[in-house]
């Protein structure tokens, strides 16, 4: 009986020591800090907003704290070019906003650019230019046409939001431009509103040079449509007035989906209609 108790005591002791040794590393191991508990460094705008909130600033005053990305048309174009360089170079920052920065935009938006682009799902305007919330006033429609609807949007951006550049951006492989190059009989088979879109594009692409390479010909057609839409936008009274005061620049752009790069059409020569 005594031998049995002794064996039992030894086994119990071994089990106790094993359990204790198993727990020991866990006690010594450092406990990782949860990611949510790590304080992120405050940005300059965060500090300004915190100070304003402590002082009891109104929402209107808080909205004014966001610094503009660009104050001139030239700065706006440079900001778009720099953002696109980051995008196609694989260095996109995809700017994120802190909660305070989002709150600062509740009552007011301050975009520095208005971009009229195609509704193609492969052409996300803010991503292409690596810009964040509130930086670009985006207007999208198939074939990036200038008509009363889109004009109303960019008029608002120019007159009330004081955007510094209006970009008309076409893109590689645009389906609307491709359809506008089809024979009239095929275009007539489309629904009414699709035909309306094609009617706004067809005049720009009917006299495209006889280029053998399909890709090169398509590029020329898209750029021809961009030139036409830029010309129409420049005739808009609100746009014309802002350009005359050097408050706005109107440029064209061609986005190459395959590379991610945007080529800008800025000079009179580049924007001249054929």
Residue ranges and their predicted role:
Residues 1-4:
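Positively charged n-region of N-terminal signal peptides that target proteins for export
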Residues 6-16:
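Bacterial N-terminal signal peptides
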Residues 18-22:
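Sec/Tat signal peptide C-region and signal peptidase I cleavage site
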Residues 23-108, 134, 144-152, 156-161, ...:
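Divalent-metal-activated hydrolytic enzyme cores
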Residues 112, 162-165:
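Loop/turn elements at helix/coil->beta-strand transitions in domains of secreted/extracellular proteins
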Residues 117-122, 142-145, 171-174:
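Short glycine-enriched loops at secondary-structure junctions
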Residues 122-139, 145:
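Catalytic core of membrane glycerolipid acyltransferases/transacylases, capturing the structured
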Residues 168:
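Conserved functional hotspot residues or short segments at active or partner-binding sites
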């Amino acid at each position: 009986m005594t031998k049995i108790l002794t064996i039992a005591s030894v086994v119990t002791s071994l089990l106790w020591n094993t359990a204790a040794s198993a727990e020991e590393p866990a006690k010594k191991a450092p406990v990782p800090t949860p990611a949510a508990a790590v304080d992120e460094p405050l940005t300059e705008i965060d500090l300004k907003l915190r100070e304003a909130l402590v002082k009891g600033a109104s929402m209107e005053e808080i909205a004014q704290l966001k610094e503009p990305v660009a104050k001139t048309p030239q700065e706006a174009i440079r900001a778009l070019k720099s953002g696109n360089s980051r995008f196609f170079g694989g260095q996109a920052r995809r700017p994120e906003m802190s909660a305070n920065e989002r709150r600062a935009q509740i009552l007011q938006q301050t975009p520095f650019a208005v971009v009229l682009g195609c509704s193609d799902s492969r052409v996300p305007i803010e991503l292409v230019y690596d810009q964040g919330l509130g930086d670009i006033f985006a207007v999208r429609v198939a074939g990036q046409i200038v008509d009363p609807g889109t004009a109303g949007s960019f008029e608002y951006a120019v007159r009330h939001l004081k955007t510094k550049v209006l970009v008309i951006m076409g893109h590689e492989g645009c389906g609307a431009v491709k359809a506008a190059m089809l024979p009239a009989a095929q275009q007539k088979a489309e629904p009414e509103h699709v035909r309306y879109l094609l009617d706004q594009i067809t005049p720009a692409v009917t006299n495209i040079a006889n280029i053998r390479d399909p890709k090169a010909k398509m590029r020329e057609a898209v750029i021809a449509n961009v030139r036409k839409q830029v010309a129409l936008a420049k005739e808009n009274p609100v746009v014309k007035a802002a350009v005359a005061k050097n408050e706005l620049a109107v440029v064209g752009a061609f986005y190459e989906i395959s590379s991610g790069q945007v080529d800008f059409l800025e000079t009179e020569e580049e924007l001249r209609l054929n």
